[in-house]
A protein has these predicted regions:
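C-terminal boundary of histidine-terminating zinc-finger modules
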Residues: 85-102
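Acyltransferase
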Residues: 99-114
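Secondary-structure transition/hinge residues
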Residues: 26, 112-119
Length: 127
């Protein structure tokens, strides 16, 4: 299971509960991604619209429950990301140099590496 959160503490708390539920149902949490993270503005300053540290809070919260996982990335909130989403166009295809697109690509690469080592079936059976 890939846990996605935002920087806000409440969202991180919900994400910890989702990760805990995943583990209780026999699934593994392969990583945490923070969406809507800080953006770096043209003048070099950082804009944390929704705060920061949500992904790290999820990893810490899961660790307190003996669940080991890692932060795979922080997807920044960018104007092009919102525009691409509104138009139904994948950001990585339309604006590959956008910081959000670059981070999405890094997260995808990390997921490929993590899942390529596994060929597992879910521990589920029909009723």
């Amino acid at each position: 299971v890939l846990i996605v959160t935002t920087p806000q503490p409440y969202a991180a708390g919900v994400a910890v509960r989702a990760g805990s539920l995943a583990v209780q149902t026999g699934q593994r949490v392969i990583g945490v991604v923070e969406n809507m993270s800080a953006s770096v503005l043209a003048d070099g300053t950082t804009l944390d619209v929704f705060g920061s540290g949500g992904a790290e809070a999820v990893v810490s919260g899961l660790a307190r429950q003996s669940v080991s996982t890692t932060v795979l990335g922080h997807i920044p909130l960018t104007p092009l990301m919102a525009q691409a989403a509104d138009n139904g166009i994948p950001l990585v295809a339309s604006h590959a140099q956008d910081p959000a697109a670059q981070e999405l690509s890094r997260v995808a690469d990390a997921l490929l590496k993590l899942t390529a080592r596994e060929n597992r079936t879910l521990p589920l059976s029909p009723r």
